[in-house]
Amino acid sequence: AEEVLVRDGPAGVTVRAVAAQAGIAPMGVYNRLGGKDGLVDALLIRGFDMLRAAVAGGSEPDLLDRLWACGLRYRDFALANRHFYAIMFEAAIPHEFGSEEVAVHAAAAFEALVQNVDLAAAAGQIQVADPREAAQQIWSTVHGAVALEMRDLVLTPDPAATYRATLLMILRGLAPAT
């Protein structure tokens, strides 16, 4: 399914196309995944797991550097995995986003950001009343910036520089009062 998504985009993800790619009859996809909804769930789970790995995968000793890198990796993930990003956040494949298993994996991706915020707050490198609330605000901001870029709606000459400036604005806004 992943190969079909990457090759053909969200519109190309059909039970028949995935079965052909796997060299099986379409019934095999139904038996294994329960049909189109199960197929899309499997792709969503894979996408959220990849996103979690990207944003959590920091070993920077300075926790502000880790938050900075986390933000950069979010954008890198989206740009490198446009079709996954589209099915995860743009409903590029009509699908009920109600699977409990998908929700668990989506929440785990968010928790990676919460953990980075919590660590930086506990170390006194940022000042937040509630790390989860701050993580939601950070995610909302970077997601908006990435979504605009994905749709070619960034109206500045260098989207990467604009994104970095957005991250800097976020981190300055979280800096402890002096």
Q: Where do the PLM segments sit?
A:
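Hydrophobic alpha-helical connector segments
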Residues: A56-F84, A134-I138
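Helix-turn-helix
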Residues: V4-G38, A42
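Amphipathic alpha-helical linker/stalk segments
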Residues: I45-A69, G98-V104, A122
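Generic hydrophobic, amphipathic alpha-helix propensity
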Residues: A1-E2, V18, L43-L51, V55, ...
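Small-residue (primarily alanine) positions within well-ordered alpha-helices
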Residues: A1, A19-A22, G71, A135
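Short hydrophobic clusters on alpha-helical segments that form packing/core surfaces
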Residues: A1-L5, V13, G47, L51, ...
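Hydrophobic/aromatic-rich alpha-helical bundle segments in the mid-to-C-terminal region
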Residues: A86, E96-A103, A107, A121-L168, ...
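C-terminal alpha-helix
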Residues: N116, M169-A177
